[in-house]
Amino acid sequence: MLPNKKFFSPGWYFQKARLRFAKALLDLGIPLKFTSQIDDFQIQFVTTSLLEYSLRAQKSYTRERVTMGWLRNFVGAGDVVYDIGANVGAYSLYAGKKLKSSTGRVYAFEPAFFNFSALCKNIEVNWLNDIVLPFPVAFTAVSGPDKLFLSSTISGSALHAVGKKESEGKSFAPRFTQGVLSS
């Protein structure tokens, strides 16, 4: 007998099973390729963490509606886009796909070493290396060498801090400290 329809959703169970399977593969060190269909574009991600797989690759385009609205409505042929804090590149990749047949460019800035590596891989698998140019640089009030305090070293993570062990007004114990050039 099937559970009460009110509480039974086969789609939910399949989604959970797919997520558990993805986690098992990622835990074994097997990177997963995920393709997001957004507007007229297929955007590929090579993911190495569950956070990157479930949040950045699958949900970036629906979570930040204001960012997507801006990219959809204001980025056009020949434009230059600066993605500061690009993470693994979801918005850089979308802008790059929009600008692919024009002279436009995307400059993607991501200082965290693991996110920068993922950003570069995602640019490569989407064939956007002539349009999206990544830089491992942080933007702060003071230029020069500094410390980047990483709240996590998991690909796709965020809320890191330059100069102070504080993010969004809260102190944190860094998982790793990385040297960074600030601009």
State the predicted function of each range.
Residues 1-183:
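S-adenosyl-L-methionine
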